[in-house]
């Protein structure tokens, strides 16, 4: 994925009313996130499940400033991304209709490992979860945090 495509994908994910399912519909219909933003309203209206509110929200230019800030954070923190159409996207997630468009990871993680715990929806780990991980119960497995 090019920097430009990552930028537009991050922007698409910032559009109000666009989650992973809608984003994938738009990307698959238009070809990529860059083309989603370049598409005419009449073309977007033909996509099943894409309503006038989402089409209107795609015109919100503030999503690009948010995407730029996200790109800077990714570079600053040395975070890598895996796109849902990438060859190395986890096989088990490819079969989930609502799997993330982008995975973010820090460090060297084998996303195809057979024993993995996924934590979805949080960037702040709770005290209870910290205790659970430190207890040694899950030492030989990888942990994913999706947010």
Features from the language model and the residues they span:
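Phosphate/pyrophosphate-binding betaalpha-module
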Residues: 138-147
């Amino acid at each position: 994925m090019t920097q430009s495509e990552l930028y537009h994908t991050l922007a698409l994910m910032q559009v109000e009313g666009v989650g992973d399912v809608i984003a994938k519909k738009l990307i698959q219909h238009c070809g990529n996130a860059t083309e989603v933003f370049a598409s005419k309203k009449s073309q977007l209206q033909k996509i099943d499940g894409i309503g006038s509110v989402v089409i209107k929200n795609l015109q919100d230019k503030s999503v690009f400033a948010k995407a730029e800030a996200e790109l800077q954070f990714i570079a600053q923190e040395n975070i890598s991304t895996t796109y849902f159409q990438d060859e190395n996207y986890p096989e088990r997630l490819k079969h989930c209709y609502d799997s993330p468009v982008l995975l973010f990871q820090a460090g060297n993680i084998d996303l195809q490992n057979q024993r993995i715990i996924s934590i979805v929806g949080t960037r702040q780990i709770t005290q209870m979860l910290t205790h659970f991980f430190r207890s040694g119960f899950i030492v030989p497995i990888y942990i994913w945090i999706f947010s």
